[in-house]
């Protein structure tokens, strides 16, 4: 269960850093943690700025213009960036503080694993196992972020955040969610569905070896539609989806099961809008067919909604699934809880040091030709 793309916090990296950014009575953040957070906030703000009519990738003037974030808040970009960086830093301190108050003990093996993961990201990147070596130290080290600070603001923070979440909402927690409430949420918000996609085109390769899609003839399309509509009728009469798939595999001469089944919150699903709408309209135990796309990219779908009530014991009984349901139910509330604690946190801010780091530090001009040049490429010693 991940709560942020890169958010870590283990032992605060103070011993290797001469400068600090924020601190409480018993905790201190290295300036590198602030720089990392400022960079993360910059990237997010830039994505909002790109929606502006007069956004210019060759200039950093957008930093002095108002942007609108995902919550609809409008603010001058550079101020938004600094505020978000500060908010992130205070969240790091809050999580550490609350772990102590909740008496949460994270095993050393778990912390070591998180640190090791950060080291991997730092040295070879998160996609090295897939053949893409992109060391994250190249992105951060030049700005003054050390491995310690990077780890503090990424994998360790995720580890601690998740541990605190479980301590608060798990069994025996200060805000424990009962099995009854979790089950109620599951039944009301989750959907158990399956669908079978059938391409209305064939794929071939030309003489150069390039793949090319060719739309089926009207006769071929009607054959597919008739077959899937027949399955739909069988399901609507109480038939089994497993039987439908077995029949389709036999008729198509394929041993591969191309159907997809999921139990999830439909609104948060990554499936297409058309599928979401079709599944959302279905009654339990019913099926429907629909066509998505056109020409040489069209797909015909058979969609089916199962009875979510039959999944309670088997789904929530699985520890990993239960954690996922709990996260879906309480993650937004927990985020606001942490934000609220951050607003009440007693801390010191090392303003004279923090003010040395401006949002434009991260600006990279992108010319119309897509050639990039860095405008503020001065390297700094790692913090």
Go through each PLM region and give its residues:
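N-terminal accessory alpha/beta regions
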Residues: 92, 96-98, 102
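Hydrophobic alpha-helical transmembrane segments
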Residues: 84-89
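Short, low-structural-confidence N-terminal segments
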Residues: 1-79, 83, 343-344, 348-383
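PPIase-associated folding chaperone regions across multiple families
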Residues: 13-17, 138-222, 270-383
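Surface-exposed patches in mature extracellular/periplasmic domains of secreted proteins
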Residues: 103-111, 240-247, 289-291, 349
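Charged, solvent-exposed helices and adjacent loops that form client-binding or oligomerization surfaces
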Residues: 43-81, 100-183, 215-219, 266-273
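Solvent-exposed coil/turn segments that connect beta secondary-structure elements
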Residues: 27, 34, 39, 198-203, ...
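Peptidyl-prolyl cis-trans isomerase
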Residues: 226-274, 314
């Amino acid at each position: 269960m991940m709560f942020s793309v890169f958010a870590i916090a283990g032992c605060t990296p103070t011993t290797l850093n001469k400068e600090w950014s924020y601190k409480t009575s018993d905790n201190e953040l290295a300036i590198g943690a602030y720089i990392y957070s400022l960079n993360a906030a910059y990237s997010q703000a830039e994505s909002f700025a790109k929606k502006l009519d007069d956004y210019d990738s060759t200039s950093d003037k957008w930093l002095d213009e108002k942007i609108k974030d995902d919550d609809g808040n409008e603010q001058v970009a550079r101020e938004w960036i600094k505020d978000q960086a500060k908010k992130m830093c205070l969240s790091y301190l809050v999580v550490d503080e609350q772990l102590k108050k909740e008496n949460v003990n994270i095993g050393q093996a778990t912390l070591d694993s998180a640190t090791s993961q950060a080291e991997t990201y730092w040295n070879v990147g998160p996609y090295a196992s897939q053949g893409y070596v992109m060391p994250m130290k190249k992105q951060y080290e030049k700005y003054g972020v050390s491995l310690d600070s990077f780890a503090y603001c990424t994998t360790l923070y995720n580890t601690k955040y998740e541990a605190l979440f479980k301590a608060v909402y798990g069994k025996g927690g200060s805000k424990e969610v009962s099995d009854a409430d979790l089950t109620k949420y599951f039944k009301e918000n989750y959907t158990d569905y399956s669908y079978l996609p059938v391409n209305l085109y064939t794929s071939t390769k030309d003489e150069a070896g390039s793949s090319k899609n060719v739309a089926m003839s009207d006769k071929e399309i009607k054959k597919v539609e008739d077959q899937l509509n027949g399955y739909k009728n069988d399901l609507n009469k109480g038939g089994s989806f497993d039987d439908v798939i077995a029949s389709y595999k036999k008729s198509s001469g394929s041993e591969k099961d191309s159907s997809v089944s999921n139990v999830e919150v439909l609104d948060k699903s990554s499936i297409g809008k058309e599928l979401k709408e079709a599944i959302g309209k279905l009654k339990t135990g019913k099926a429907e067919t629909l066509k998505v796309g056109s020409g040489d990219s069209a797909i015909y779908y058979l969609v089916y909604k199962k009875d979510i009530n039959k999944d309670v014991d088997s789904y929530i009984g699985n520890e990993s699934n239960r954690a996922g349901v709990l996260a879906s139910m309480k993650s937004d509330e927990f985020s606001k809880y942490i934000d609220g604690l951050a607003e009440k946190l007693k801390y010191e801010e090392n303003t004279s040091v923090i003010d040395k780091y401006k949002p434009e530090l991260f600006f990279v001009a992108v010319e119309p030709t897509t050639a990039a040049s860095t405008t503020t490429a001065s390297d700094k010693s790692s913090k």
